[in-house]
Amino acid sequence: METKELILKKALDMFAKSGYDSVSIRDIAKAVNIKESSIYYHYKNKQDILDS
């Protein structure tokens, strides 16, 4: 699975479990074991992930 897909899958799981407002980009990066900058390479922001 590519990084972008991993970010999306993990973020959506986290949003469902904890709520969108409770999850940060930092939380997603930590869960996927990547740097925050890698998320911003693929997505503009958290809303962009949700809209994907």
Where are these regions (language model features)?
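An amphipathic alpha-helix adjacent to DNA-recognition modules
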Residues: 4-9, 13, 21-22, 33, ...
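Append "Primarily bacterial transcriptional regulators
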Residues: 27-31, 39
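Cytosolic nucleotide-binding catalytic cores of signal-transduction proteins
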Residues: 18
